[in-house]
């Protein structure tokens, strides 16, 4: 089983507009609302692509109830820890080929709730082969909270795919609790290292050799339309993807995380792991709704992905 962790989930609201007009009224016809947060996007893609998945994290208030009811109508096993605060909304405005996001901060987690979740999570880990940990930390949790989750998983021999940024990611990278895989982009690498990181292959090689990333088995750097650059152990790969019509790119990174977790769970080869992860990312980009894949086109896209050692 794959366990997904979303500590700061949301209801994701998508507003497609031909043009975003500032300081006036914008009317939206086609609004979509989904149980969201990066980890729940991962969750949906996992079950839609055929994996058994349990979702956990914090939920509270009426918005939390909406998320739980959405998940209960799917093949997902919801196993959330209830809190006193209200789960958040996150809004994505899709306009003129751009994506503008408005993200609520979310609830503040009490010390008692934080400790209670660690016990809850420890029990779930014992039933899991792989865990994904995604997104921001809610207010009230220390930057080393993900480190604690990774250590608990490591103690049980469970692989961890971590997808976060900023101080929580830096704290993990500087700790002894190493995830199995991370999926940074250029912007996140630049933030971590305090210098601009381009998409140049030789530069990326040097960056991923830095001591900050030691002990991490898989590093997959997403390069958008340029595919991905990856490091597994001491081996580097460049992944090339076909040009595709993009409908909604929101959630494609989360879909890639789902692919990495699924491939680790089924012990795929390096090339197959990368192809599976990138295929799910592309399939998501072809859907209107966030964090969804239509597996009908899987083989067609998968066959067009090139993976080469560099």
UniProtKB/Swiss-Prot annotation:
Protein's pathway: Carbohydrate metabolism; D-tagatose 6-phosphate degradation; D-glyceraldehyde 3-phosphate and glycerone phosphate from D-tagatose 6-phosphate: step 1/2
Pfam families: PfkB
Lipoprotein listed as a keyword: no
InterPro entries, sorted: Carboh/pur_kinase_PfkB_CS, LacC, PfkB_dom, Ribokinase-like, Tagatose/fructose_Pkinase
GO molecular function: ATP binding; phosphofructokinase activity; tagatose-6-phosphate kinase activity
Induction record: By lactose. The operon consists of lacABCDFEGX.
Class of the enzyme per the UniProt entry, highest EC level: transferase
GO CC, any one term: cytosol
Chemical reaction(s) catalysed: D-tagatofuranose 6-phosphate + ATP = D-tagatofuranose 1,6-bisphosphate + ADP + H(+)
EC number: 2.7.1.144
The keyword Transferase is assigned to this record: yes
Organism domain of life: Bacteria
Biological process (GO), any one: lactose catabolic process via tagatose-6-phosphate
Alphabetized UniProt keyword annotations: ATP-binding, Kinase, Lactose metabolism, Nucleotide-binding, Plasmid, Transferase
Additional notes on this entry: This gene was sequenced from pMG820, a laboratory-derived deletion of the naturally occurring plasmid pLP712.
Family: Belongs to the carbohydrate kinase PfkB family. LacC subfamily.
HAMAP family: LacC
PANTHER family: 1-PHOSPHOFRUCTOKINASE (PTHR46566:SF5), 1-PHOSPHOFRUCTOKINASE-RELATED (PTHR46566)
Protein name: Tagatose-6-phosphate kinase
Organism of this sequence: Lactococcus lactis subsp. lactis
Source lineage: Bacteria, Bacillati, Bacillota, Bacilli, Lactobacillales
Gene: lacC
């Amino acid at each position: 089983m794959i366990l997904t962790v979303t500590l700061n989930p949301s209801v994701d609201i998508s507003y497609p507009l031909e043009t975003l007009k500032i300081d006036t009224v914008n009317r939206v016809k086609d609004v979509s609302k989904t149980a969201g947060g990066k980890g729940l996007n991962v969750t949906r893609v996992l079950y839609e692509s055929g994996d058994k998945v349990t979702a956990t994290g914090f939920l509270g208030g009426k918005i939390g109830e909406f998320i739980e009811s959405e998940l209960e109508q799917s093949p997902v096993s919801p196993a959330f820890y209830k809190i006193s605060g209200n789960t958040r909304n996150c809004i994505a405005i899709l306009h003129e080929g751009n994506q503008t996001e408005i993200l609520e901060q979310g609830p503040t987690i009490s010390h008692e709730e934080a400790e209670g979740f660690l016990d809850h999570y420890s029990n779930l880990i014992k039933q899991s082969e792989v865990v994904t940990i995604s997104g921001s930390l809610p207010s009230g949790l220390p930057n080393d909270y993900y480190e604690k989750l990774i250590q608990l998983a490591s103690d049980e021999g469970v692989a961890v795919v971590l997808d976060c940024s900023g101080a929580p990611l830096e704290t993990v990278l500087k700790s002894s609790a190493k995830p199995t895989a991370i999926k940074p982009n250029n912007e996140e690498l630049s933030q971590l290292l305090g210098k601009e990181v381009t998409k140049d292959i030789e530069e990326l090689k040097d960056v991923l050799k830095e001591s900050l990333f030691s002990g991490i088995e898989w590093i997959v750097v997403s390069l958008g339309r340029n595919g991905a650059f990856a490091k597994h152990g001491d081996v580097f790969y460049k992944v090339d993807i076909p040009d595709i019509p993009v409908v909604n790119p929101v959630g494609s990174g989360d879909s890639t995380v789902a692919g990495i977790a699924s491939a680790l769970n089924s012990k795929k080869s390096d090339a197959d792991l990368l192809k599976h992860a990138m295929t799910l990312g592309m399939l998501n980009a072809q859907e209107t709704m966030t964090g969804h894949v239509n597996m009908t086109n899987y083989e067609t896209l998968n066959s067009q992905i090139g993976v080469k050692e560099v």
